Amino acid sequence: SGQTCSKCKKRNHAMCTSECFSGLKIHTIRANYPLWLKRITEVQQGKAVLSVRQWSGKPYRSPQIEITRLTVKHGVDIQKVVLYRTEWYDDDNKCHYCYDVTLDNDKGINIDDIARNDGLNPIDFIEWFDRDICKQKLDDDGRVHKELAIIHFTKFRY
């Protein structure tokens, strides 16, 4: 839900088949890390399952369809990441942006890899998350950032 299908270019892709996606989705990225940490901890303790869903039609205005249920046996886990956007003005008098992603331990992640593993191409990934990051205030380094949760569906980790 909310992703752009790389083949048909529809933002609301609930009608798209899985082969339309730009890649295999092995995780999802969500805001509110503390909430997701609590939920994923319950899954890891065997007290809950992770229900992976998508909208059947228009997001937030249609029923959700459950795709699968995941447990600790599937490798469900969480990692905190920070998406940064650096802004500057060049000689052309236009604002330019550079994006980077780091884990909470400051290990950098290739933005192409994280986008692909989230089922998106890099441009769609940046466009999707830029809507939230642009609402943040500039820090002293001229960057804006947003803390996010990567919810892993498999044993893969960055």
Residue ranges and their predicted role:
Residues 1-158:
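Catalytic phosphate/metal-binding cores of nucleic-acid and nucleotide-processing enzymes, i.e., regions
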